[in-house]
């Protein structure tokens, strides 16, 4: 009897702590030869996270693909985008939400994750994958900070992808009920090379340590009793 082909997986990998942990989990389950990492440029103010995504993919020995979708966001004034004159906020998600009165935070790129997931689904299917992974987590959607990270959004996109591919592809988002500290805990267990990752909204040699994403990342490592390797 002919042996069944191994299942292949695609992981959306930004180069940050969350998606790098997700990549490690996929590699553990499917083996590096059966995992693809997809990294997407969207016109962000620096390329540091894409460089980190490449380093993490190389570390795990997985094939990597890149997409550039910057043109789609050319009309957006999101503070993360290179053409925007808005300052990237230094407040935590919770503080930003309080200021925004429950509206999405200023670093919300309009429907970015919907576009990312649709693009990833097309690429995953073309690469012969039967599963794709998305690293949205609780801290991102709590209080409507990023509505395209919410459980409702994840469920809707998972259904659309399954229906739109005729059941050939499924989407999994295992972190949607986890906070960042829980993700880091799992990553530490797996030996994720967090020193290769990048989360900061700035693109310097070292993280700024004060922007919202730096503060949340530092707190996640602190909650696990360790120092973020990028802050040593």
In which residue ranges do the predicted regions lie?
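Short, intrinsically disordered, charge-biased short linear motifs at domain edges
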Residues: 187-189, 194-203
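Local cysteine-cluster metal-coordination motifs and their immediate loop/turn environment
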Residues: 118, 198-219
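Short cysteine/histidine-rich metal-coordination sites, predominantly Zn2+-binding motifs
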Residues: 203-204, 224-232
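Short amphipathic alpha-helical interaction/hinge segments
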Residues: 165, 222-225
């Amino acid at each position: 009897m002919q042996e069944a082909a191994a299942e292949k997986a695609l992981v959306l990998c930004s180069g940050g702590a969350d998606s790098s942990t997700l990549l490690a989990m996929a590699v553990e389950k499917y083996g590096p030869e059966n995992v693809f990492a997809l990294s997407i440029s969207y016109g962000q103010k620096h390329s540091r996270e894409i460089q980190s995504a490449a380093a993490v993919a190389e570390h795990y020995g997985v094939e990597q693909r890149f997409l550039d979708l910057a043109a789609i966001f050319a009309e957006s004034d999101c503070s993360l985008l290179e053409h925007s004159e808005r300052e990237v906020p230094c407040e935590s998600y919770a503080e930003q939400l309080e200021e925004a009165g429950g509206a999405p935070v200023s670093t919300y790129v309009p429907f970015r994750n919907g576009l990312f997931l649709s693009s990833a689904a097309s690429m995953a299917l073309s690469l012969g994958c039967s599963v794709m992974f998305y690293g949205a987590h609780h801290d991102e959607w709590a209080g409507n900070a990023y509505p395209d990270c919410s459980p409702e959004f994840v469920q809707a996109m998972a259904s659309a992808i399954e229906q739109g591919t005729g059941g050939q592809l499924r989407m999994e988002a295992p972190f949607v009920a986890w906070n960042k500290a829980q993700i880091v805990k799992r990553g530490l267990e797996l030996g994720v090379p967090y020193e290769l990752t990048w989360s900061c909204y700035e693109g310097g040699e070292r993280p700024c340590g004060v922007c919202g994403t730096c503060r949340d990342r530092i707190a996640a490592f602190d909650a696990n009793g360790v120092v973020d390797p990028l802050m040593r």
